[in-house]
A protein has these predicted regions:
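Tandem repeat scaffolds
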Residues: 2-242
Length: 242
């Protein structure tokens, strides 16, 4: 049996014991188990609870982590592609350059975390939470973010092109230089958000709320703002450049 297989067995023993005893996995240094390069694809990690674990570059592709909970963990460069992360709760974690493409993230929470250059392309993150999370230069291309709560999130340079943002909440979010091309953002709440330099090309912002938002140097070409709310006299200026 090779070393990677041994690492997988040892990790799954820890996980199974945690699941069976309903215990929190606390401060496990996964680097000692060489988990940084382990492949845990297709594993069942549902309802696991863990804090302060190191899991850089771990491969969890197509695994189930439904209703799992992670606090103060490091998942930089981790592979979560096509995972079932429904109702997962993650806080104060690091996901730099991790990949959540095509993951099921309905009702998932990634709050007060760091997701620098993280990929969420085509993920279903509907009704989830990204409150206070850093998402600089992350990508959500064609993702479903309907009903997401991203209040005070830092999305500077983030790519949401083609995403579903209907009924989403981005109050006081940093959206500088964000790409919102061709998004469906009907009824979205952008109150007091900073859109400086953002691209809203061909987006649907029907009934969206931009009250108090900073809108300097925004590209509005082709955008639909029918019924959208703006500060006094702002909508007239926007309509002139669409």
């Amino acid at each position: 049996m090779d070393e990677k297989s041994n690492d997988r067995i040892r990790v799954m023993e820890i996980v199974s014991r945690s699941q069976y005893n309903d215990e929190v996995i606390d401060q496990v240094d996964m680097s000692d188990l060489d988990l940084s390069f382990s492949d845990l694809s297709f594993s069942d990690l549902s309802e696991v609870m863990a804090r302060r674990i190191m899991a850089k570059r771990v491969v969890l592709r197509a695994s189930s982590l439904m209703r799992a909970a992670f606090h103060d963990c490091d998942f930089e460069l981790a592979d979560f592609r096509s995972c079932n992360l429904e109702e997962i709760n993650m806080a104060d974690c690091r996901f730099g350059e991790a990949d959540f493409s095509k993951a099921n993230m309905k009702y998932a929470k990634i709050n007060i975390s760091s997701c620098f250059e993280t990929r969420f392309d085509e993920a279903d993150f509907s009704h989830g939470e990204l409150v206070g999370t850093i998402l600089n230069h992350a990508t959500f291309r064609h993702a479903n973010l309907s009903g997401i709560d991203a209040e005070q999130a830092d999305c500077t340079g983030t790519d949401f092109s083609g995403a579903n943002l209907t009924n989403s909440k981005f109050e006081k979010a940093h959206l500088e230089n964000v790409n919102l091309s061709a998004v469906d953002a009907r009824n979205a709440n952008f109150t007091e958000a900073d859109f400086t330099g953002a691209i809203l090309l061909n987006g649907d912002f029907t009934e969206a709320d931009f009250t108090g938002a900073k809108l300097d140097n925004v590209v509005w070409t082709g955008a639909n703002v029918e019924g959208a709310k703006f500060d006094e006299n702002v909508k007239e200026q926007v309509l002139k450049i669409i």
